[in-house]
Amino acid sequence: MLIGPLKREIDILTSDECRKLMKACSQKAPTGIRNQALIVVLWRSCLRIQEAIDLSPKDVSSDSIRVHSGKGERARTVGLDPESSAVVERWARLRQELGFKPSQRLFCTLKGEPLETSYCRHLLKRLAKKAGIEKRVHPHGLRHSGAVHLLDEGHNVVVISQQLGHSNLATTNTYLNHLKPADVVAAMQT
């Protein structure tokens, strides 16, 4: 019997590590402000990288994001907390000041071209190094981290599943099953 390749365990970032990642972005350069917004959308809204880079400005409101190109072509609306909304709004205002057209993607280069997934992966790796984060940081890891943080904050698994765009709760449970053996042992000691 053939066994497929082992899946690499996803490193879950703490909320503090996610914030460090955002702080590693330039606080003044347009690309830094854009990158902060991209990180917060991947992390707090739990979007897939392609869903995030496919967003247009009209897809984002003060409390939600409308995803049109979800996996399996299923559209959905996800929530956006006030703190994250402020970060995204800052980028939305700046991109308007820079003269970007509403028809251009929300997350684009300074020339108005859509971001590439490979660029985003490289960007997160570079920012993680700058922030002193030793864990493997990548777009899907931010999505997983966001889901775990939502659970830690007391959100219902059904709500988290809808945020993630999963059609099956079992898929969501694999995202949330990130307990380390030491955590399980410690829980049994109380």
Pin down the residues of each PLM region.
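Conserved catalytic core of the tyrosine transesterase superfamily
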Residues: 1-190
